[in-house]
Amino acid sequence: MKIHKTSSETALPNQKENQMNQIRLHVWGDYACFTRPEMKVERVSYDVITPSAARGILAAVHWKPAIRWVIDRIYVLKPIRFESVRRNELGGKISAGKVSGAMKRKSVADLYTLIEDDRQQRAATVLKDVAYVIEAHAVLTAKAGADETVTKHIEMFKRRAKKGQCFQQPCLGVREFPADFALIDEGEPLPPSALSESEANRDLGWMLHDIDFDHGNTPHFFRAEMKDGVIDVPPFYAEEVKA
């Protein structure tokens, strides 16, 4: 397994600086589905939110090309409960060839999918009644301007989160499962955990960490362990993160 280092994270982060620029976001919802990639036919969720899904939630609140969100820690607040449901999905998607043809014709007249003709009902094993606290920091990317600072973006995120603002509705894995969110201010206690001692400590197995977009969209995985309801997420370039 190869380990790649992304251009947005080219050096070890400064721990003290990360703590100063750290945010904590409480997210929750009725249902969630963080799909396991090894399940090809039916959707089956991981036991908890993945770092990539957590990053997507933060980016939905605030993101610019100048920054990348790095997930440090995930707090699991509610017991892991699964439910089997049936979801309507499309059997396919519009092909790249059709999109290219529409661009050349400068017309989208034929660029559509008839949902009623392509709808399929599929079983899914999803999570029910979930709540997490996402602890993260931001790093500057190669696209950051000379006047860009991490602190500026952290403050922008905090202002937007306090007001409930977002670029798009955050979701818990899939769009059908929206996420509610609330900023946890510095010094403010975390929401209470409903986990029992046995539920709070478990090996969650190999889990998707994130996608390496700089090296062929390669998925990277890490061995997730929950201790006292907390999952420490290793840095993307750490030795224990495998491609």
Residue ranges and their predicted role:
Residues 27-31, 78, 134-142:
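Beta-strand elements of well-folded, non-transmembrane domains
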Residues 19, 68, 126-130:
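A short, structural micro-pattern
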Residues 2-6:
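Polybasic, lysine-rich low-complexity intrinsically disordered segments
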Residues 39, 44-89:
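Glycine/small-residue-rich interface belts in oligomeric ring/scaffold proteins
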Residues 9-19:
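Short, Lys/Arg-enriched N-terminal segments with co-localized hydrophobic residues
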Residues 17-41, 225-227:
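N-terminal, Lys/Arg- and Ser/Thr-rich interaction peptides
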Residues 89-91, 99-243:
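Internal, well-folded beta-alpha domain core
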Residues 33-35, 82, 142-144:
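Residue-level signal for secondary-structure boundary sites
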